[in-house]
Every structure is written in C-alpha cells, then in structure tokens.
Amino acid sequence: MTIRLHRGDLPDLSRYRGDAVAIDTETMGLDPIRDRLCVVQVSPGDGSADVVQIPAGASAAPNLTKLLADGTVLKIFHFARFDLAVLFKAFGVMPEPIYCTKIASRLARTYTDKHGLKDLVREVLGQELSKQQQSSDWGAPELSEAQVAYAAADVVHLHALKQRLDVMLAREGREQLAQTCFRFLPDRVRLDLAGFAGEDIFAHS
C-alpha cells in the first residue's frame, strides 16, 4: 500500500480524476460538534492513499474542499453521517454525491448485526483490518507510522466494498432504497448539527 502524507491540504488533484473517491476522517473524539477534525484520508481506488493532517483552527484546504464539492465525483464513506458532519463543520462544504458502506451493509447484510468496517472487510473481502490505533491522539503534531498506516487502511478498501455491496443490494432489490438513504444523509447531518442528533423528528411522540 502506497501512502502519501501531507499537511494542511492535498498538493494537487492529479490523482483524483476518476468518478469515485474514498474518504475517511480522524478527530479528537466522537462528538462532531465538540471534537475537531485532525486528519482526512482519501484514496482514488488504486490501493494508495493520501493522509492529510489538518492543523487546529484550519478552515481552508482548497484542493481537498474542491474535491469534496465536486458533484461529478462519488464520495465513498463508511458511516458517512459522522464524516460529513465533521467535514461540513470544518470547511463549510457538504460532500455530495455520497455512498455509505455502513448503510449499504445494513440494507444488504440483514443476516448479521456486525456492520463495523473491520467486520465488513473481513467477511466481504477476506482481509484483516487492525483497529489498534482507533483511539489515539490524532491531534498530535507528528503522527506515528502506525497511525498513518491505520488511517490509510480505512480508505483503501472502500471501493472494493462498494462493488461487492452493490451486488448484494441488487440481489435483494434494495438498490433504490440505498440511493434514497444516501441522498438523505446531508439533511440528516444538518439535523444532527442543529441539535437533533438524538431525536427522531419523524416519530409520532
């Protein structure tokens, strides 16, 4: 796996001229309102990844935000709801269009309740994914080799997962339902950031 480490932004978008990009984020915690964005990792789907450290207080990353805002490029996430929130909060850009492998897994793999990335990669792709660095200091000025490798590993499998999950969704007749869910995600994220994360506003009571 080829990993390129950057600070502040992608140097250019020459590697991202395809129709889909895999994206993940690392933050100081799991509250998108409280915890700042520290790292954005992206992969063009060729087995390589760019890991971008985001300085504290940064609100601009021109090349990265251009990619996020490009409506012709599909953004593949795992648990997009969280990543969209932290990216929107940091840069003011809501990435679209979106594909979420976690939502796709929940719709296609109803025989299991294991929809985490590690479980998904193991079953669907037959590979092991280490999660040892999941809870670590992503705001550190210098990331360890283990952190960088962990961040990259979280995105290099997403293109392949999408392909396999698409087959399962089609087999179960849930392709259109998945697409509807993906299109709704930006609005779900705006509700989260407006303070409605723990409330089902569609419920009767």
Label for each model-derived stretch:
Residues 1-205:
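DEDD superfamily 3′-5′ metal-dependent exonuclease/proofreading module
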